[in-house]
């Protein structure tokens, strides 16, 4: 068994698509748009076959995105090396994304950094 995909709602679906394509190498399918409900989605496929569905609907409401809450906490991307973690973190910082933890080795031995995407979702970048 494997997880087929993870889905998340976003406010700006095109900006979210561009973010994952530019920084994480995702490939996006064509935009799906249900004109009856105004639901929109992209499936983003990553190099290892993992998929993320980003979705939008006009009547969505904001959720308080504190660092700790019940439910999903973050999405983690393995980029292959410490150097790539460092380089991507610098690129994201220069592009204006908030770095919530600089590259470091955690107590359980992971080398990672954490950033917030354009909508405040936590993204972990690891080896």
Spans of features found by a protein language model:
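N-terminal beta-strand motif that seeds the catalytic metal site of vicinal oxygen chelate
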Residues: 1-15, 29, 72-77
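Mid-chain, well-packed structural core segment of small domains
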Residues: 68-89
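A generic structural micro-feature
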Residues: 36, 46, 67-69, 105
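Core segments of cupin and vicinal oxygen chelate
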Residues: 9-52
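Exposed loop/turn and edge beta-strand positions of beta-sandwich/beta-sheet ligand-binding modules
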Residues: 38, 71, 109
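A short, acidic/glycine-rich surface segment
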Residues: 29-31, 54, 59-64
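Vicinal oxygen chelate
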Residues: 31, 43, 89-127
